[in-house]
């Protein structure tokens, strides 16, 4: 709350344009209890940036759930789109659906291969988003030990990359966000691309790695190869006859989790349309696909509900 004696003109006068934009967005968001979009990095600090256009500025859009007296879980959401676009129904719709269950949603606009970016730019954006939510947990009513990552299709590949390539943060950084761990506390992988090998999605691989990636890069970003005992618990689902992203991707990640004793659930459903999302639209979300009920049951087991 701003004290009644504060002179806003003086406050604004000592702010940089970037600080004013972020501060105004935060204040308006808190007053409206609505979504706001914030840059993930301060102006000029995006690693590997190719410019200052909208496509060069990764952002986080907040979808706060109704607040309670206790800190609540949060889901960082990575929409799919083959690393060439971002599917709104796999971002905002997921966040609004989870809001009804008391889970805060944070949707990431990450950099894309269609705009000239390649790995590791996308991973940097996803990791920064988890760090940002953890660093700002108290301000948003988030439990810093219940921050998940959720992704669909190529967004699922990015989520699985963070699940297997996270770090503990840089304790020496002057940026408090960078001091935070990027490890999610759990993951949700929806018809996810997992492998960069034979059963990968060709467009996602090309947009992420370019035309002629090295064998080492293909191995490293085939995330079934990178599961360890430190990989967080994960909920995995696919449609049996998905023609774009074969179920072998989900099965490979589940098999790796089993081998390394990582808690997981794997659900394979009848059907074939790729990219179905919830199978229902806001605001009512009538008759969603059964995977949503299975996810909510699993989240309850994880003590997220």
What do these predicted ranges mean?
Residues 51, 63, 123, 237, ...:
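C-terminal catalytic histidine-bearing segment of alpha/beta-hydrolase fold enzymes
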Residues 79-84, 240:
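Active-site glycine-rich loops that stabilize anionic/oxyanionic intermediates
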Residues 71-81:
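Short beta-strand element of the alpha/beta-hydrolase
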Residues 34-70, 202:
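N-terminal cap/lid segment of alpha/beta-hydrolase-fold proteins
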Residues 128-202, 218-219:
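Primarily recognizes the serine-hydrolase "nucleophile elbow" in alpha/beta-hydrolase
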Residues 43, 176, 192-226, 232:
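Mobile cap/lid helix-loop segments that gate and shape the active-site cleft of serine hydrolases
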């Amino acid at each position: 709350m701003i004290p009644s004696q504060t002179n806003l003109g003086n406050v604004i006068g000592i702010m940089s344009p970037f600080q004013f934009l972020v501060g105004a967005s935060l204040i308006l968001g808190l007053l409206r209890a609505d979504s706001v979009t914030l840059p993930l990095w301060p102006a000029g600090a995006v690693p590997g940036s190719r410019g200052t256009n909208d496509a060069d500025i990764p952002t986080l859009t907040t979808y706060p759930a109704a607040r309670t007296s206790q800190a609540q879980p949060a889901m960082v959401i990575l929409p799919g789109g083959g690393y060439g676009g971002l599917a709104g129904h796999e971002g905002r719709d997921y966040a609004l659906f989870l809001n009804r269950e008391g889970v805060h949603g944070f949707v990431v606009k990450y950099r894309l291969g269609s705009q000239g970016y390649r790995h590791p730019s996308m991973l940097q954006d996803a990791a920064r988003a988890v760090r940002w939510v953890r660093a700002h947990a108290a301000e948003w009513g988030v439990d810093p030990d219940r921050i998940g990552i959720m992704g669909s299709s190529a967004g699922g590949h990015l989520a699985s990359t963070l699940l297997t390539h996270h770090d503990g943060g840089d304790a020496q950084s002057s940026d408090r966000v960078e001091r935070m761990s990027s490890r999610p506390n759990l993951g949700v992988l929806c018809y996810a691309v997992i492998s960069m090998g034979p059963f990968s999605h060709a467009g996602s691989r090309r947009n992420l790695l370019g035309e002629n990636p090295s064998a080492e890069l293909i191995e490293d970003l085939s995330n079934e190869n990178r599961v360890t005992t430190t990989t967080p618990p994960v909920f995995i689902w696919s449609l049996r006859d998905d023609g774009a992203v074969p179920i072998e991707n989900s099965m490979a990640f589940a098999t790796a989790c089993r081998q390394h004793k990582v808690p997981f659930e794997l659900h394979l459903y009848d059907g074939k349309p790729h990219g179905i999302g919830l199978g229902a639209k806001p605001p009512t979300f009538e008759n969603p696909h059964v995977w949503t009920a299975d996810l909510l049951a699993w989240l309850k087991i994880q003590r997220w509900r």
